């Protein structure tokens, strides 16, 4: 599931003698804290314990762990839903700097639909498929985040592996932003284990065009380095973007072996900054990535 918009993780520390709680972003640092927003809705699905909080025009979709920790999956400004509030989601859009010509894209993991809202605004001609395994997430995204299918966007309730095994038109970009409540079927960050194998990466490659790109939202955990090595072994070229002061790394895996020089990326980023309506600076993303 999206993380998107995805992917922030917050740990809610509750103590008997502590009045209040600290909320830590999934992809944030231990120093991040914010006042808890009121709970607006709560539901359990077959995959996750889902909670929605709202503060004025900002609505947040969270997963709740077994010990009560809250994990932010999406955050939307209801007045301007196309604005990406979570930093990691902006870094995922560096895909446009690496592969500027995008006609078809796939998002694995819906969450609250932040990426859907952004791409409708930023690239309205883009043909977009979104695969989400949890039907409750799809319903919640519709009812609370106005994230639903339209003429250029399909939302498919299916496991991503099964979807990608089917025949279909190739994608220019695939965004991997799938997270569930942590379980024996996921890694420590909530990524389904069957979406991390060498076999899965081969299936993904088969659904890309020859110059296609896969963008992974990775959370730093005990096997983080192994995750990057597995992606590096499967794809001809990778680009890494560490999100400043956060616990996540965006890895863009390209089918094109030749490396794009930093000067080329910077030039493309400057062109997007001048001509697009992203609401953030692509050059700033490249400059601040670590």
Give the location of each predicted region.
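Active-site/binding-pocket entry motifs
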Residues: 67-69, 180, 257-259
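N-terminal secretory signal peptides that target proteins for export/translocation
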Residues: 1-5
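The AdoMet/dcAdoMet-binding core of the Class I SAM-like
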Residues: 54, 83-213, 221-224, 234, ...
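Class I SAM-dependent transferase core
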Residues: 29-99
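SAM/dcSAM-binding transferase cores
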Residues: 35-37, 42-43, 47-51, 73-78, ...
């Amino acid at each position: 599931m999206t993380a998107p918009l995805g992917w922030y993780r917050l740990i809610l520390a509750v103590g008997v003698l502590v009045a209040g709680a600290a909320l830590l972003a999934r992809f944030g640092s231990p120093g991040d804290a914010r006042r808890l927003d009121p709970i607006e809705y709560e539901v359990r699905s077959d995959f996750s314990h889902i909670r929605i909080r709202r503060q004025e025009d900002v609505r947040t979709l969270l997963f709740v762990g077994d010990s009560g920790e809250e994990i932010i999956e999406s955050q939307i400004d209801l007045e301007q839903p196309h604005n990406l509030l979570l930093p990691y989601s902006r870094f995922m859009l560096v895909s446009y700097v690496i592969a500027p010509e995008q006609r078809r894209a796939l998002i694995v993991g819906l969450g609250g639909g932040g990426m859907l809202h952004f791409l409708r605004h930023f690239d309205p001609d883009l043909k977009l498929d979104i695969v989400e395994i949890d039907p409750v997430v799809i319903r919640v995204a519709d009812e609370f985040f106005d994230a639903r299918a339209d003429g250029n966007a399909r939302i498919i309730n299916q496991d991503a592996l099964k979807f990608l095994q089917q025949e279909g038109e190739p994608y220019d970009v695939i965004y991997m932003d799938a997270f569930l409540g942590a379980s024996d079927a996921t890694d420590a960050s909530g990524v389904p284990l069957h979406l991390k194998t060498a076999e899965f990466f081969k299936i993904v490659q088969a659904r890309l065009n020859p110059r296609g790109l896969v963008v992974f939202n990775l959370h730093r955990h005990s096997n983080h380095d192994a995750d990057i090595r597995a992606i590096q072994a499967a794809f001809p070229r990778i680009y890494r973007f560490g999100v400043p002061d956060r616990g996540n790394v965006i890895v863009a895996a390209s089918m094109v072996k030749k490396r794009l020089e930093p000067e080329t990326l910077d030039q493309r980023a400057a062109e997007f900054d001048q001509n697009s309506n992203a609401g953030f600076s692509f050059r700033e993303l490249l400059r601040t990535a670590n």
